[in-house]
């Protein structure tokens, strides 16, 4: 018989820097998961992505074992790095925080494709463009 999933925990952690301190410790500890085992496995899988925030989905099973799936970095982080800014505009309707090209937008959309609910790259580009617009990032041809 397959193991029963008792909880799915979603966290966003810095790549290669997971440690037992909050938010990891309390989130996993209350389900009886071996926190250090998760931290070592997560850090090993994400050491090549240093500097990014990586969303992770942890499935905890009834026997206290776990599996986890790494997602792509949040669109806002990808956009900030692409535009070379530290934060989005305070008022995105009036301010322009940065600029990216359509080619860069397509590249970001292709990166995010596995995690987006989009059937084509064009649809994914529209989703990422909406995120860019809300952050005050202008898209140029």
Curated annotation (Swiss-Prot):
Family matches, as SMART domains: RL11 (SM00649)
Organism the protein comes from: Fusobacterium nucleatum subsp. nucleatum (strain ATCC 25586 / DSM 15643 / BCRC 10681 / CIP 101130 / JCM 8532 / KCTC 2640 / LMG 13131 / VPI 4355)
HAMAP family: Ribosomal_uL11 (MF_00736)
Role: Forms part of the ribosomal stalk which helps the ribosome interact with GTP-bound translation factors.
Protein name: Large ribosomal subunit protein uL11
A GO cellular-component term linked to this record: cytosolic large ribosomal subunit
Matches recorded under InterPro entries: Ribosomal_uL11, Ribosomal_uL11_bac-typ, Ribosomal_uL11_C, Ribosomal_uL11_C_sf, Ribosomal_uL11_CS, Ribosomal_uL11_N, Ribosomal_uL11_N_sf
PTM annotation: One or more lysine residues are methylated.
PROSITE patterns, sorted: RIBOSOMAL_L11
Gene3D superfamilies: Ribosomal protein L11, C-terminal domain, Ribosomal protein L11/L12, N-terminal domain
Subunit field text: Part of the ribosomal stalk of the 50S ribosomal subunit. Interacts with L10 and the large rRNA to form the base of the stalk. L10 forms an elongated spine to which L12 dimers bind in a sequential fashion forming a multimeric L10(L12)X complex.
Family, per entry: Belongs to the universal ribosomal protein uL11 family.
Keywords: Methylation, Ribonucleoprotein, Ribosomal protein, RNA-binding, rRNA-binding
Leader peptide range in chain numbering: none
GO terms for MF: large ribosomal subunit rRNA binding; structural constituent of ribosome
GO biological process: translation
PANTHER family: 60S RIBOSOMAL PROTEIN L12 (PTHR11661), LARGE RIBOSOMAL SUBUNIT PROTEIN UL11M (PTHR11661:SF1)
Any Pfam family hit: Ribosomal_L11
Superkingdom of origin organism: Bacteria
């Amino acid at each position: 018989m397959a193991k029963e999933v008792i909880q799915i925990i979603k966290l966003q952690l810095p790549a290669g820097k997971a440690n037992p301190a909050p938010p990891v410790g309390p989130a996993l500890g209350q389900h009886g998961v071996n926190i250090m085992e998760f931290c070592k496995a997560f850090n090993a899988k994400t050491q090549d992505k240093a500097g990014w925030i990586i969303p992770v989905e942890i499935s905890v099973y009834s026997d206290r074992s776990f599996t986890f799936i790494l997602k792509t970095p949040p669109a806002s982080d990808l956009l900030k790095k692409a535009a070379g800014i530290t934060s989005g505009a305070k008022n995105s309707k009036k301010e322009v925080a940065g600029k990216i090209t359509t080619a860069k937008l397509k590249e970001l959309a292709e990166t995010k494709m596995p995690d987006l609910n989009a059937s084509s790259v064009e649809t994914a580009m529209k989703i990422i463009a909406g995120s860019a617009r809300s952050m005050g990032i202008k898209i140029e041809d």
